[in-house]
């Protein structure tokens, strides 16, 4: 029996908040080997350049667990939705590069947690918009959807 449950969980305090604060992109393959201790990445052997995108509101990360008893398989399908307000040429060019690439993605939430999306396979942009909005209060900016399918959920990161 290699799949034994090892612990439970009590109801935590109501101190968490939703949302993503910052998203970082690094070129695929630049992480090198990750050191994973107790389900947490504590370091990488590579020297990736991380490119920071600050986001506010309407950005989220969700991981669906897909498991098949018939096939004996389980994988994790993570979807990262990001919204960037305001349009400018430099951002549009970077988003074009990201859309053509398969980056590793680090996500910082508003609870101070960092997650690594696409450790093994990278992430793929599978949608997005460049929008001007119609009314004065509408979004003018960019939306981007990044998807990563992995054999493990996004790892917590300590460094």
Task: Report residues per predicted region.
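Solvent-exposed edge beta-strands and adjacent loop segments
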Residues: 9-81, 122-136
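Short, acidic/charged, Gly/Pro-enriched secondary-structure junctions
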Residues: 93-117
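Short, conserved charged micro-motifs
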Residues: 89-96, 155-157
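Mixed-charge, glycine-accented linear interaction segment located at domain edges/termini
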Residues: 120-159
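A general structural signal for short secondary-structure junctions and capping/turn motifs
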Residues: 72, 95-97, 106-107, 134-138
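Oligomerization/assembly interface segments of phage tail-like spikes and tubes
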Residues: 68-89, 138-152
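Residue-level signal for secondary-structure boundary sites
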Residues: 90, 113-115, 152-154
């Amino acid at each position: 029996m290699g799949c034994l449950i090892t612990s439970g969980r009590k109801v935590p305090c109501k101190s968490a908040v939703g949302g993503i604060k910052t998203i970082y992109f690094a070129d695929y393959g630049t992480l090198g080997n990750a050191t994973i201790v107790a389900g947490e990445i504590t370091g990488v052997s590579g020297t990736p350049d991380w490119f920071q995108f600050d986001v506010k509101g309407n950005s989220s990360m969700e991981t669906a667990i897909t498991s098949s008893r018939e096939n004996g398989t389980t994988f994790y399908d993570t979807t990262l939705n990001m919204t960037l307000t305001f349009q400018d040429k430099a951002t549009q060019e970077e988003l074009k590069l990201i859309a053509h690439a398969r980056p590793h993605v680090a996500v910082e939430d508003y609870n101070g947690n960092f997650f690594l999306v696409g450790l093994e396979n990278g992430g793929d942009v599978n949608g997005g918009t460049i929008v001007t909005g119609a009314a004065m209060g509408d979004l003018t900016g960019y939306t981007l959807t990044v998807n990563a399918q992995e054999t493990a959920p996004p790892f917590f990161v300590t460094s």
